């Protein structure tokens, strides 16, 4: 089955803000190329959710109404309605907490 994907602005913003903060903290060693490469990789990984990963129950309370997927260094909260996957939220593994 082929799914269509919708990514909420919240999920994209979480990825961008994480890497923006990394670039501010490590400004002498973290380049703009690294910033854009890491953001693009995290967003590209969102499109692999149902192709490579199994649906899991979330391990954090704020995602209790969603499925959870882990790919690379990111966890994604998503819902499936019909043939549409909606990615609701994203969280880097360093920030996983309730």
Please state what every model-predicted region is.
Residues 67-98:
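Enriched for short, Lys/Arg-rich terminal
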Residues 1-65:
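Basic, Lys/Arg-enriched alpha-helical interface segments
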């Amino acid at each position: 089955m082929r799914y269509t994907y919708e990514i909420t602005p919240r999920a994209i913003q979480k990825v961008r803000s994480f890497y923006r903060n990394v670039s501010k903290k490590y400004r002498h060693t973290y380049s703009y190329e690294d910033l854009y490469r890491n953001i693009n990789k995290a967003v590209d990984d969102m499109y692999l959710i149902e192709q490579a990963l199994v649906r899991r129950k979330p391990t954090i309370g704020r995602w209790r109404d969603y499925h959870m997927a882990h790919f690379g260094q990111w966890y994604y909260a998503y819902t499936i309605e019909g043939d549409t996957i909606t990615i609701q939220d994203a969280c880097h593994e360093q920030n996983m907490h309730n």
